[in-house]
């Protein structure tokens, strides 16, 4: 009875409007434009993403802040059989179903400084928060410590540009 019913009211349809693979970090960036009633999300939340109705949805952190324009993106680490094939299977214009947002990763604090520590793909909630701060700046100072095996290539350059925005 509960199969495919829980969360049904949180499902929206979107379209992939870009796919980019960052070879040096084995990460795929998937840009999505939602078509209808996405209520928005907070930095650090995730959604169940279904790129193909023949497959089960997978949970991925929403890597972008919400601007209210329907655009968002996911940074997905190529870790297993499913995620390692996404870059070759996903196409611009392809339909996608999102369910969410879920989770709570809070950045709320009355302290003047925050220290963020992330490793690898764990950077995604912090990237989303950087996007949110670019839209609505805060007086808090943020120190970000990002641990990765490679600090070169376009993926890292994009993360650095996001941090400096």
Go through each PLM region and give its residues:
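Ferredoxin-reductase
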Residues: 4-97, 134, 140-143, 147-151
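A short, basic/flexible loop-to-alpha-helix module at the beginning of a structural domain
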Residues: 101-111
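A generic secondary-structure signal
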Residues: 104, 132-133, 162
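Conserved beta-strand elements of the Class I
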Residues: 113-117
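Histidine-anchored nucleotide/phosphate-binding helix
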Residues: 123-137
